[in-house]
From Swiss-Prot:
Gene field: kae1
EC numbers: 2.3.1.234
Keyword Transcription: yes
GO biological process terms, semicolon-separated: positive regulation of transcription by RNA polymerase II; telomere maintenance via recombination; tRNA threonylcarbamoyladenosine modification
PANTHER family the record matches: TRNA N6-ADENOSINE THREONYLCARBAMOYLTRANSFERASE
Protein name as catalogued: tRNA N6-adenosine threonylcarbamoyltransferase
One Pfam family named in its UniProt record: TsaD
UniProt lineage: Eukaryota, Fungi, Dikarya, Ascomycota, Pezizomycotina
Amino acid sequence: MLAIGLEGSANKLGVGIMLHPDDGSSPQVLANVRHTYVSPPGEGFLPKDTARHHRAWVVRLVKRTLREARISPDDVDCICFTQGPGMGAPLQSVAVAARMLSLLWKKPLVGVNHCVGHIEMGRLITGSTNPVVLYVSGGNTQVIAYSSQRYRIFGETLDIAVGNCLDRFARTLHISNDPAPGYNIEQLAKKGKQLVELPYTVKGMDCSFSGMLAAIDALAASYGLDGPQSDEAVDANSPAAVEAGENGKPTRADLCFSLQETIFSMLVEITERAMAHVGSKEVLIVGGVGCNERLQEMMGIMARDRGGSVHATDERFCIDNGIMIAQAGLLAYKTGFRTPLKESACTQRFRTDAVFVKWRD
């Protein structure tokens, strides 16, 4: 079976083609292409601008995936698309494209939960069996475990997502958004040496990041580190970003280092608590923030201390992509699931545990 997957819940537009061979052998990624809307330094991406980007690029990406996979529309069994969660306008622009392909190619639609797409792609690539999942991205922060054909949420953010916290601090420092603000924060953090104390807010298996963001924004302002320092965006490799401050004054690199260390410590704590609760020795990290090497390192230390292991994917599959939507969509399609055209509206707050996972025991 072949599926084409369309993802566009945020600023990344992805199209992928997945093959599930009829002989039951391992699924194959035939094509996985992506194009990112990059906003100017110091700014986030607005829904209307992101949707405009997706509309401009989606047909080109679909054509490119068909060429790379060396297939025709006749070979495709279903059209899978992200139905939520995400930003309304970008979601809708990709849903319209999916409906167009469904009508044009006369193929059934399969609406996919974005979070479930991340989980299923992570399970496929890493080979993890029944892990505790840490899902961390620009719009989501959840600790998840599978039970009784649902991906149950054991803990989550009480306000903003971890990726949103990192991205917004990148705006405060006027760090470049290319290739991604979180990535540039990570590169600066590697050069930081001074740990600045920040609010640490964990409540059971839930966490909060808004207070931490407010505190570090205030610190940056008090040390004159907020806003553009020159006519150009801050380069993570520039000496000005990492030079030691006077009288122990923290640098931008120190603030990025402190933010990462505090956030990731919170994530490790709630993940370990979930592991103890469900009795799992595996952790699967998914979502765009899951690419962060320091997060993987800290989680690995915790997991090994418990006699367990950590699984993560590289940027091809960790960052939003179309192939994860094709993978999750095909799993649902093979159980008989279809999304009628009249039920294909997007849901911005599509909960992970709202999906009936019929394809797992």
